[in-house]
Amino acid sequence: MPIVRFFQHIIDLFVTLILWFYFLFGYLFILVFLYIPAYVFAENRTTAFQNLNHVHLKCFFALTRLLIPRTKFKIPKDVREIRSSIVICNHLSYLDPLLLVSLFQRQRTIVKHTFFQVPIFGWFLNNYGYISSGSGDMIGPAMINNLEAIKEHLASGGILFVFPEGTRSRDGNLLPFNKGVFTIARYCNAPLKLIFIKDTNKLFPPGHFLFNTRNFNEIQLELIGSLEPDYKGNNFSISAVADQARNLFEAKIAKIKSKETEKPSQVYRQK
């Protein structure tokens, strides 16, 4: 009924405004009371900022669970306990990086260069130790500095999470992989953890402003593979490792699609 849909959209709008108000203005509030003291007094400013960002987004998702009870989160222990690794994920929604920051206290990632140019937000990204994808940051001395910083970060227990697709998938299918993350992994001699993200796009779809508060949904994160390549081996190939990672993601997607096609046929047989 139109009147029912109208009120459903009003609820979506109300919840969305609350969540984004907390997300945006929470940064400004924390800036005054926590970030500035950390900036001035913290021994390791980057670590302090990552911890604060982690707490801020952990609260964001606690608020999300409270306001959208029809959405559940299934995040197993083996995902939460990942340390000293490069985490590779598929990408479905703007919520994906926020969710990962809320899970991992020590995290870095690679962010589109344009976000670093946004006032205030870009300042936060720099102080989190996040890395710009701009060409100037991926060549010469800047690249070496970034790689050394990542290597030290991983050695101290942190994680680097990356979406090798580079953008959100609109249909759930895997987009082409950028192989740069595998080059970083070789430089840092780091293990690769493959996390499959499911159904964040149902809560906050690409191209939409509103959260979907009406549908029952379960957001899942699953560790679908752990790779520890022999980076110094004579037969090591970045392309081969990238293909191996991609194959694991594609196998997971195929398995999900197979289950989804089985459900209608099972219902039909029951009738």
Predicted feature residues:
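Catalytic-site beta-strand/loop segments enriched in glycine and acidic/polar residues
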Residues: H153-F182
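A cross-family acyltransferase "interaction/gating" segment
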Residues: F121-G122, G172-F236
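Membrane-anchoring hydrophobic helices of lipid-metabolizing enzymes
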Residues: P2-S85
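Catalytic core of membrane glycerolipid acyltransferases/transacylases, capturing the structured
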Residues: Y39, E43, Q50-L52, E81, ...
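Short gly/ser/thr-rich secondary-structure transition/capping motifs
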Residues: L66-K74, M143-I144, F204-G207
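Long, non-transmembrane cytosolic or organellar matrix-exposed soluble domains/tails
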Residues: R214-K271
